């Protein structure tokens, strides 16, 4: 958009926000409200969504997907209306800022859709920050985090980034002082898994086994110690994801991916969140790059990433 209509000049604020992996996920029993309490450790990784928010002279919110997106979205139905999480974030910001002009959101997708990495949540976090800047709302990070929590359990973490412990339904975040870089390979799938379906499958498996579990109260301190020290070997021994077996039940090929990753040199691996993305831990950037290349030769889509990385950040602010 390169127009000045009367006194209106378009402006674009571009923000990037990271995807995440769960290096630990303990899931409690099904609650009466239909949710599950969790105790999780989130790690923001160097795979980013970008949102370019451009002011428009007319009211309303529009959304498009950038052709620069690195994902094959030909078979993916991404809603571009009020069902889209970025759209919802812009609507909340419009209400809070009482802004009278509209906004167009162009989303560059890089985080796998329905891959258990919070791509949609990253879009929402990026949109909150972009619209806050675009409309000069002047909200603090704490105020933005409060709005983020209204949008979904993973949105506050995409705003925060780094490493954090998540309790409750995952939205009660406490930053963890773990800044040592860890190197991972992400193996993405050409299909998605429904998070609610994965949780329902876990409930079914537990019921069939007569297994009862307690409400998770805290994460294993050994995980935080390993992350603080940057000790990949120590971390490999305490990786856990209660949802993993449910994800494998729904997508048995994930077991093969995990096995292949470890046979090709990963220290350890796990399904990230509800899947189907698989996260494989390595010792170094060089090891991660080599593993990603090897898995690519086996026909898998593998990406070398590192974490932790910061949360949503403005990368450009341009008057058009």
From Swiss-Prot:
Residue positions of the active site: 20, 154
EC number(s) given by UniProt: 2.7.1.148
Annotated S-S bridges: none
Enzyme class: transferase
Binding-site residues for ATP, renumbered to this chain: 112-122
Annotated coiled-coil segments of the chain: none
Known pathway: Isoprenoid biosynthesis; isopentenyl diphosphate biosynthesis via DXP pathway; isopentenyl diphosphate from 1-deoxy-D-xylulose 5-phosphate: step 3/6
Keyword Kinase found: yes
Molecular function as annotated in GO: 4-(cytidine 5'-diphospho)-2-C-methyl-D-erythritol kinase activity; ATP binding
Cited Gene3D superfamilies: 3.30.230.10, GHMP kinase, C-terminal domain
GO biological process, any: isopentenyl diphosphate biosynthetic process, methylerythritol 4-phosphate pathway
Keyword set includes NAD: no
Keywords, alphabetical: ATP-binding, Isoprene biosynthesis, Kinase, Nucleotide-binding, Transferase
Protein family: Belongs to the GHMP kinase family. IspE subfamily.
Function, in words: Catalyzes the phosphorylation of the position 2 hydroxy group of 4-diphosphocytidyl-2C-methyl-D-erythritol.
Protein name: 4-diphosphocytidyl-2-C-methyl-D-erythritol kinase
Gene field: ispE
